[in-house]
Amino acid sequence: IKTPSTEDALSWLSEFTEEEAKMSLSLTDNCPILAKEYLRTNTIQTREDFINDISGIIKSGKDIVTISKKWIEDLDTLPMKVEWMVKILYDTIKFHADDSLQKLTEDTDNISRYLSQNTHIEKVHNLLAQTYATWTQFSSDSNLNKEYQLNSLFIDWEKLLGISKKV
């Protein structure tokens, strides 16, 4: 099945603001059914909160324990947030490989670009593997302690990205 044009998708999402519709289409790779679900379930606000949290961790070493507890309180969105972390790292690798790229994921490009310029790429690759492994555990609904796993992941981000040295 062919993905509809952006105009058709925006028309289908006309009950929402154009800005919201474009953002949700961007987050869902132009999949209007999923975009509508994102808009109905307030996933856009979850995304904004995620960006604030993750950029705080990356740029200023924001309290990872507090953020971890906050994320654990909403287990339904946890796999999605970790998937978004994976996407940031993918984009970081792409920006590092080709600095002429203008745009990948509009709302997190600044984070990915920052990481591509301030972190050794080997560390990003290692962190990507660890983040993806954590996402797999959360997505498969394993019986491992999710709070422990998330804290461990945030500590890996801190260590491998050198955040604590910047604070």
Tell me what each language-model feature is.
Residues 1-84, 88-167:
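Charged, glycine-rich active-site and insertion segments that engage polyanionic ligands
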